[in-house]
Amino acid sequence: MAKIIRIKGEILGKDEPMVFTKEYNVVKEDDALETMYSEMGSKHSVKRAYINVLEVSEISEEDVQSPILKKTLEMY
């Protein structure tokens, strides 16, 4: 069964860390982490060592904040 995982973290940069929150609908928590590392590294040209994960939590459908994920969940 799929879970909704919220990942909070920061990307270390030259000036201040960039804080982010990402939400994924995945089967395993590890899949969410791998997808997040891949997306953030690709978009921001940063290596995984510069991405700090601060919190990983499973959330309910009602707690989803991402508009794209909300629309996806409404389709099912």
UniProtKB/Swiss-Prot annotation:
Keywords, sorted A to Z: Ribonucleoprotein, Ribosomal protein, RNA-binding, rRNA-binding
A Pfam entry, by short name: Ribosomal_L18A
Gene3D superfamilies: 3.10.20.10
Origin superkingdom: Archaea
Keyword Disulfide bond attributed: no
Gene Ontology molecular function terms on file: large ribosomal subunit rRNA binding; structural constituent of ribosome
CC terms in the record's Gene Ontology section: ribonucleoprotein complex; ribosome
BP terms from Gene Ontology: translation
HAMAP family: Ribosomal_eL20
Quaternary assembly: Part of the 50S ribosomal subunit. Binds 23S rRNA.
Similarity-based family: Belongs to the eukaryotic ribosomal protein eL20 family.
Protein name in UniProt: Large ribosomal subunit protein eL20
Origin species: Methanococcus maripaludis (strain C6 / ATCC BAA-1332)
